[in-house]
Amino acid sequence: MAQVCEICGKGPQFGNNISHAHNVTRRRWNVNLRPVKVKVGPTANKRVRVCTSCIKSGKITKA
């Protein structure tokens, strides 16, 4: 499963770990995703993976 928000499309960001000796290794910061039941229609609900910023901003309506 991809680490991508199904509402805004936000995905992981990539960067570097840098130690005190300045050794550099690649790393990634994942999105804070939560499985949420969302209202799709008047009677239908769907479970989607949504980032917490979309939940806080009210872009979805929970079922």
Curated annotation (Swiss-Prot):
Superkingdom of this protein's organism: Bacteria
UniProt cross-references to Pfam families, sorted A to Z: Ribosomal_L28
One term under GO cellular component: ribonucleoprotein complex
Entry-linked Gene3D superfamilies: Ribosomal protein L28/L24
Molecular function terms from GO: structural constituent of ribosome
One Gene Ontology term from the biological process aspect of the record: translation
UniProt KW keywords: Ribonucleoprotein, Ribosomal protein
Family: Belongs to the bacterial ribosomal protein bL28 family.
Protein name, per record: Large ribosomal subunit protein bL28
Organism, as annotated: Acidobacterium capsulatum (strain ATCC 51196 / DSM 11244 / BCRC 80197 / JCM 7670 / NBRC 15755 / NCIMB 13165 / 161)
Taxonomic classification: Bacteria, Pseudomonadati, Acidobacteriota, Terriglobia, Terriglobales
